[in-house]
A protein has these predicted regions:
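N-terminal accessory/interface modules of nucleic-acid-binding and processing proteins
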Residues: 2-316
Length: 316
């Protein structure tokens, strides 16, 4: 006699979905927190454009966005992957990639917003259409986890540093930011909407010039007439570390999106200090999951803002 399938009430299904979503959220955050503790952060590691770029969906060819590029790059660093193409189990199966041996939990979680349309009656008795958003998680796997994985035969050459600086200058011109090339210090002044960079000859490495330029461009996106982030925070404060975190992540996302190499050691001499501030900031956060999500989201917005001034990019 066949066993009847167990039926669940609507309330039980809702409770299970809520429990599973919270478990996924905890797992997502724990991966990021552990990376911070172990100094395994993607904006602190070098990435070569020819082998590793922005995490991309294997099937749609679109770049992941929001908090997902950072969290997937963290997973790649921990596991030692350099091919940053990902897909769901079904997508890998459809692409003839062997998922044999891969268990639930072996992949990495991406998070995205789902929309639920609904209607409400306003004070005038009229029906208004509204949309409710909620966070949902999905597990994706790196192509290198597949048994029949083969490295790509053709690797893209990184865009020359001279071309990358043209992109930077285009952003500066489009936004009306004042740029001066003098002195020995790189900085952004939100009061004057001004970027100061040492002269081209002052840089011992041309890639260092690119990285420094886009780091300061990341800060410039926070101006009140752009993305309006709190700027001008005191050195060593949690808010200072938070803004530095945004600038470092946005610089990495922008440079890799434009096809360049990323070498963080060339950007910031205060990396170790910022790491300590970041840990303290994270520990002080009452809602650490949302705090990290906000940092990653702000970095993505900063990078998107720069890229939209330069070129159109296809993302998901």
């Amino acid at each position: 006699m066949a066993m009847s399938k167990q039926k669940f009430t609507k309330a039980e299904k809702k409770a299970y979905a809520k429990k599973r979503n919270q478990e996924d959220a905890d797992r997502w955050f724990n991966q990021l927190e552990q990376a911070i503790v172990n100094n395994e952060l993607p904006w602190q590691k070098p990435w070569a454009a020819g082998t590793a770029s922005i995490p991309t969906n294997l099937v749609t060819k679109k770049r992941y966005r929001g908090t997902n590029p950072i969290s997937l790059m963290i997973g790649a660093l921990v596991e030692g992957w350099t091919d940053l193409r990902f897909g769901t189990r079904q997508q890998l199966y459809d692409a003839k990639m062997s998922t044999k041996g891969l268990m639930d939990g072996d992949g990495h979680l991406i998070r995205f917003f789902k929309q639920i349309p609904y209607e409400v009656e306003n004070d005038d008795g009229e029906i208004e259409k509204k949309v409710r958003y909620y966070v949902q998680y999905s597990e994706v796997f790196c192509v290198e986890q597949c048994q029949n994985y083969e490295p790509p035969k053709h690797k893209h050459k990184p865009v020359p540093e001279s071309e990358m600086m043209k992109f930077f200058n285009k952003f500066i011109e489009d936004q009306g930011i004042t740029l001066e090339r003098k002195g020995s210090r790189a900085f952004y002044s939100s009061k004057k909407d001004y970027i100061g960079l040492p002269s081209h000859e002052s840089f011992t490495d041309s890639l260092g010039e690119v990285m420094t330029a886009f780091h300061e461009a990341g800060h410039a996106t926070g101006h009140k007439d752009r993305l309006n982030r709190p700027l001008g925070n005191g050195f060593g404060s949690a808010d200072y570390a938070f803004e530095e975190l945004i600038a470092e992540m946005s610089s990495m996302l922008t440079v890799l999106s434009l096809g360049g190499d990323f070498v963080p050691d060339l950007v910031n001499e205060e990396g170790a200090n910022n790491q300590a501030y970041l840990k303290n900031w994270l520990q002080a956060c009452k809602d650490r999951d949302n705090a990290l999500s906000l940092a990653f989201s702000d970095a993505q917005k900063a990078s998107d803002f720069i890229l939209e001034s330069i070129e159109g990019v296809d993302e998901e």
